[in-house]
C-alpha cells in the first residue's frame, strides 16, 4: 500500500532565490548526488513553459492582490511550497502519462485550496530518486498576505484528508498517512534536508559574489 506525501513549508524572501535555483535546476555544478543530470531534461513545470523569476512573480502577485499599501515586512512569509509525492513503488506501477496525471490532479486540488491566481509554479522532478512535485504559491487570503491564516491546522487536516480521496476517485491506488502519527515519510524529510542545504549553499555563493563586487568597486 502506498501513502501520499504532502508536505507544506513557508519561506521568506531571502530563501526564494535558492528555491528557484533548486526547482529550475539553474546550478551548473549541482551538489545533490541524487540528481541524475541525464534525466534532468525530463523535468517539467505544469504552470510555466520556461524558467521564471520567482521573486518577480511573487512581487507582482502581492502588488496586484494585496489591499494594504504598506510595505511588506522583510521577515514576512511571501512564498509557500507543497511537496507532493509517494514511494518509489507507487510510481513504478504508473506510466509516464499516468504519473503526470497524478501531479495534474494534485495541482488542481491545491489550486482550489489556495486560489489558482496565487500559484507560482508546479515543478515536477523526475531526475531524483523518487518523482515529486514542488508546488509553490503566494499565501494570499482575503486580499492580505498571511501564511498563518491560510495554512493553519484546519487547512492541513483538510488537505491530508481530502487529497488522497480525490486521487483515489481518479483511479490512483494511494492512501492517507496515519492520522496523528509522529512518523514522517522518509521522502519528505530527505526533500527538506536537501533543499535547505541547497538554499544555504546558494546564499553563501551570493554573499561571496557580493563581497567580490564591493572589493572591485573599491579598487576602481
Regions found by a protein language model. Give the residues of each.
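N-terminal nicking endonuclease/strand-transfer module with a His-rich metal-binding environment
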Residues: 1-219
